[in-house]
Amino acid sequence: RMDPRLFNVSTTAAPTKEELGFHYLWRFYKTLPKNGHITIYDRSWYGRVMVEKIEHLTPDYRTNQAYEEINGFEKSLIHDGLFVIKYLIIINEEEQLKRFKQREEDPMKVYKITDEDWRNREKFSAYDDRMNEMVNRTSTEYAPWILLSGQDKKAARIKVLEHFIQH
Protein backbone atom coordinates (compact mmCIF):
# COMPACT_ATOMS: atom_id res chain seq x y z
CA ARG A 1 0.00 0.00 0.00
CA MET A 2 1.06 3.51 -0.70
CA ASP A 3 0.15 6.31 1.66
CA PRO A 4 -0.87 9.40 -0.36
CA ARG A 5 0.42 11.61 2.46
CA LEU A 6 3.94 10.59 1.42
CA PHE A 7 3.51 11.89 -2.15
CA ASN A 8 4.25 15.33 -3.48
CA VAL A 9 3.67 16.56 -7.02
CA SER A 10 6.08 19.24 -8.17
CA THR A 11 5.15 21.26 -11.23
CA THR A 12 7.84 23.22 -13.00
CA ALA A 13 6.99 26.64 -14.36
CA ALA A 14 9.33 29.32 -15.66
CA PRO A 15 12.01 30.11 -13.08
CA THR A 16 11.37 32.95 -10.66
CA LYS A 17 13.60 36.01 -10.43
CA GLU A 18 15.28 34.47 -7.37
CA GLU A 19 15.81 31.12 -9.11
CA LEU A 20 17.42 32.81 -12.10
CA GLY A 21 20.19 33.98 -9.76
CA PHE A 22 21.32 30.39 -9.19
CA HIS A 23 22.38 27.36 -11.23
CA TYR A 24 19.28 25.98 -12.97
CA LEU A 25 19.31 22.76 -10.89
CA TRP A 26 19.22 24.71 -7.59
CA ARG A 27 15.46 25.05 -7.54
CA PHE A 28 14.98 21.29 -7.79
CA TYR A 29 16.95 20.56 -4.64
CA LYS A 30 14.13 22.23 -2.69
CA THR A 31 11.61 19.75 -4.09
CA LEU A 32 13.51 16.50 -3.60
CA PRO A 33 11.60 14.00 -1.46
CA LYS A 34 12.36 13.43 2.19
CA ASN A 35 13.42 9.96 3.21
CA GLY A 36 10.46 7.62 2.70
CA HIS A 37 8.57 10.10 0.54
CA ILE A 38 7.94 10.33 -3.21
CA THR A 39 8.03 13.36 -5.47
CA ILE A 40 6.42 13.19 -8.88
CA TYR A 41 7.64 15.85 -11.28
CA ASP A 42 5.32 17.33 -13.87
CA ARG A 43 8.12 18.68 -16.02
CA SER A 44 11.51 18.92 -14.39
CA TRP A 45 15.14 19.81 -14.96
CA TYR A 46 14.66 18.51 -18.50
CA GLY A 47 13.18 21.89 -19.42
CA ARG A 48 16.78 23.03 -19.79
CA VAL A 49 17.34 20.79 -22.81
CA MET A 50 13.82 21.01 -24.21
CA VAL A 51 12.02 24.34 -23.78
CA GLU A 52 15.10 26.48 -23.21
CA LYS A 53 16.79 25.01 -26.30
CA ILE A 54 13.75 25.43 -28.56
CA GLU A 55 12.95 28.94 -27.31
CA HIS A 56 16.63 30.01 -27.49
CA LEU A 57 16.60 30.98 -23.81
CA THR A 58 19.97 29.38 -23.16
CA PRO A 59 23.08 29.37 -25.39
CA ASP A 60 23.69 26.09 -27.21
CA TYR A 61 26.94 25.40 -25.38
CA ARG A 62 25.10 25.62 -22.02
CA THR A 63 22.30 23.38 -23.25
CA ASN A 64 24.84 20.80 -24.38
CA GLN A 65 26.62 21.05 -21.04
CA ALA A 66 23.28 20.49 -19.31
CA TYR A 67 23.14 16.89 -20.50
CA GLU A 68 26.26 16.05 -18.49
CA GLU A 69 24.98 18.05 -15.52
CA ILE A 70 21.64 16.25 -15.57
CA ASN A 71 23.29 12.83 -15.74
CA GLY A 72 25.58 13.80 -12.86
CA PHE A 73 22.66 15.19 -10.84
CA GLU A 74 20.63 12.01 -11.26
CA LYS A 75 23.65 9.86 -10.43
CA SER A 76 24.22 11.85 -7.23
CA LEU A 77 20.55 11.42 -6.26
CA ILE A 78 20.87 7.67 -6.67
CA HIS A 79 24.12 7.60 -4.69
CA ASP A 80 22.24 9.43 -1.93
CA GLY A 81 19.64 6.64 -1.85
CA LEU A 82 16.88 8.12 -3.99
CA PHE A 83 15.18 6.20 -6.78
CA VAL A 84 14.96 8.00 -10.11
CA ILE A 85 12.30 6.63 -12.43
CA LYS A 86 11.74 8.58 -15.65
CA TYR A 87 8.61 8.07 -17.74
CA LEU A 88 8.13 9.65 -21.13
CA ILE A 89 4.64 9.29 -22.51
CA ILE A 90 4.66 9.94 -26.24
CA ILE A 91 1.77 10.94 -28.49
CA ASN A 92 1.81 11.79 -32.16
CA GLU A 93 0.83 15.10 -33.71
CA GLU A 94 -2.66 13.93 -34.71
CA GLU A 95 -3.46 12.74 -31.17
CA GLN A 96 -2.23 16.03 -29.75
CA LEU A 97 -4.52 17.98 -32.10
CA LYS A 98 -7.46 15.75 -31.17
CA ARG A 99 -6.85 16.38 -27.45
CA PHE A 100 -6.43 20.11 -27.95
CA LYS A 101 -9.77 20.32 -29.78
CA GLN A 102 -11.49 18.22 -27.10
CA ARG A 103 -10.21 20.58 -24.43
CA GLU A 104 -11.50 23.62 -26.30
CA GLU A 105 -14.95 22.06 -26.68
CA ASP A 106 -15.33 20.77 -23.11
CA PRO A 107 -16.30 23.50 -20.60
CA MET A 108 -14.74 21.40 -17.82
CA LYS A 109 -11.38 21.24 -19.64
CA VAL A 110 -11.16 24.52 -21.56
CA TYR A 111 -8.93 25.98 -18.83
CA LYS A 112 -6.28 23.39 -19.77
CA ILE A 113 -5.65 24.85 -23.24
CA THR A 114 -3.96 28.19 -23.86
CA ASP A 115 -2.68 30.25 -26.77
CA GLU A 116 0.81 29.18 -25.70
CA ASP A 117 -0.17 25.52 -26.20
CA TRP A 118 -1.21 26.30 -29.77
CA ARG A 119 1.98 28.30 -30.35
CA ASN A 120 4.10 25.42 -29.05
CA ARG A 121 2.16 22.96 -31.18
CA GLU A 122 3.59 24.71 -34.24
CA LYS A 123 6.99 23.52 -32.98
CA PHE A 124 5.95 19.87 -32.64
CA SER A 125 8.76 18.71 -34.89
CA ALA A 126 11.38 20.67 -32.93
CA TYR A 127 10.08 19.22 -29.66
CA ASP A 128 10.16 15.74 -31.17
CA ASP A 129 13.79 16.23 -32.23
CA ARG A 130 14.77 17.56 -28.79
CA MET A 131 12.91 14.71 -27.10
CA ASN A 132 14.85 12.13 -29.10
CA GLU A 133 18.15 13.84 -28.31
CA MET A 134 17.21 14.10 -24.63
CA VAL A 135 16.41 10.39 -24.40
CA ASN A 136 19.57 9.40 -26.26
CA ARG A 137 21.80 11.55 -24.07
CA THR A 138 20.19 10.99 -20.67
CA SER A 139 18.94 7.41 -20.67
CA THR A 140 21.61 5.86 -18.50
CA GLU A 141 22.16 2.48 -16.90
CA TYR A 142 21.33 3.96 -13.50
CA ALA A 143 18.39 6.12 -14.67
CA PRO A 144 16.93 4.85 -17.96
CA TRP A 145 13.92 6.38 -19.62
CA ILE A 146 10.78 4.26 -19.74
CA LEU A 147 9.10 5.18 -23.03
CA LEU A 148 5.36 4.60 -23.33
CA SER A 149 2.84 5.23 -26.06
CA GLY A 150 0.28 7.76 -24.89
CA GLN A 151 -2.12 7.36 -27.79
CA ASP A 152 -4.48 5.66 -25.33
CA LYS A 153 -4.29 7.93 -22.29
CA LYS A 154 -5.87 5.48 -19.84
CA ALA A 155 -3.66 2.57 -20.96
CA ALA A 156 -0.55 4.75 -20.59
CA ARG A 157 -1.54 5.73 -17.05
CA ILE A 158 -2.10 2.10 -16.13
CA LYS A 159 1.31 1.13 -17.55
CA VAL A 160 3.00 3.84 -15.50
CA LEU A 161 1.26 2.69 -12.33
CA GLU A 162 2.03 -0.98 -12.97
CA HIS A 163 5.70 -0.23 -13.60
CA PHE A 164 5.92 2.08 -10.60
CA ILE A 165 4.38 -0.47 -8.23
CA GLN A 166 6.86 -3.12 -9.40
CA HIS A 167 9.77 -0.85 -8.54
Sequence positions of predicted segments:
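NTP-dependent small-molecule kinase module
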Residues: 129-167
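A structural signal for short, well-ordered beta-strand segments and their strand-loop junctions
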Residues: 11, 39-42, 84-88, 147
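A glycine- and Lys/Arg-enriched "phosphate-lid" helix/loop adjacent to the NTP-binding pocket
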Residues: 51-69, 77-129
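Short loop/turn elements that form and flank the Walker-type P-loop nucleotide-binding site
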Residues: 33-35, 80-82, 141-142
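Phosphate-binding/switch loop-helix module in NTP-utilizing enzymes
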Residues: 73
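Conserved nucleotide-sensing/catalytic segment adjacent to the nucleotide-binding pocket
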Residues: 7-67
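A conserved segment at the C-terminal end of the G1
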Residues: 1-3
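Conserved nucleotide-binding/hydrolysis micro-motifs of P-loop NTPases
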Residues: 15-18, 44-47, 90-97, 117, ...
